């Protein structure tokens, strides 16, 4: 089989560090009957050890050459191959509670994470390799430099933990950035539930639009000082000082006023 060259347009960096591969598979804890979806199987570094433990493994791959390669592997009979763009993939089309895993293309990681949040209710857990900078933003706490819109939105849906730091030399070709593996488990009991999720998402986006400005300035088209103080938010605070549940409370308060 001829060697596959990584394609930049697909954001391909192939994991080759056997220790990291083993750590990821151990973190996923696959059981034979689990419904597992792997995003971007690439050269099957994670695919093979997962397939050994599973009766069936769904894989989503956009690269036709890799799809052809997957079909020739000794364990191909265990694979259900979905060829296409994962951003267009219907995760709900696969029945059952799912475990989702993957070495995500860094160039589409943020829109993909937001897409996956939409199917959180049908997910057991997710384990992803991502740019470390992105993982730091995902798990960041309020009042930290990395805390922002991405963290607020994903923390609404998931409990998240950085599991493994991964250096560039663990890949071929080596990326120019450090990577990390994150575990994402859907939140079972939210501190607060947004009554109008679209309103909540718009509010959070506006709140972080200009980080140096106060929450009063960033949200002036949606909320006045009285609204902010009604849910115990200081109008002089900046967006990164405000916990996710406060954004939910503010959104619900404003939505209630509009009724």
UniProtKB/Swiss-Prot annotation:
Gene3D superfamilies the record matches: Ribosomal RNA adenine dimethylase-like, domain 2, Vaccinia Virus protein VP39
Coiled-coil residues: none
Annotated GO MF terms: 16S rRNA (adenine(1518)-N(6)/adenine(1519)-N(6))-dimethyltransferase activity; RNA binding
Top-level class of the enzyme under EC nomenclature: transferase
Cross-referenced InterPro entries: KsgA/Erm, rRNA_Ade_diMease-like_C, rRNA_Ade_Mease_Trfase_CS, rRNA_Ade_methylase_Trfase_N, rRNA_adenine_dimethylase, SAM-dependent_MTases_sf
Source domain of life: Bacteria
Protein residues bound to S-adenosyl-L-methionine: 13, 15, 40, 61, 85, 103
Keywords linked to the UniProt accession: Cytoplasm, Methyltransferase, RNA-binding, rRNA processing, S-adenosyl-L-methionine, Transferase
Subcellular location: Cytoplasm
Catalytic activity: adenosine(1518)/adenosine(1519) in 16S rRNA + 4 S-adenosyl-L-methionine = N(6)-dimethyladenosine(1518)/N(6)-dimethyladenosine(1519) in 16S rRNA + 4 S-adenosyl-L-homocysteine + 4 H(+)
EC code(s) of this entry: 2.1.1.182
GO cellular component: cytosol
Matches recorded under SUPFAM superfamilies: S-adenosyl-L-methionine-dependent methyltransferases
Family, similarity comment: Belongs to the class I-like SAM-binding methyltransferase superfamily. rRNA adenine N(6)-methyltransferase family. RsmA subfamily.
NCBIfam families in the record: ksgA
This protein's name: Ribosomal RNA small subunit methyltransferase A
The organism of origin for this protein: Neisseria meningitidis serogroup C (strain 053442)
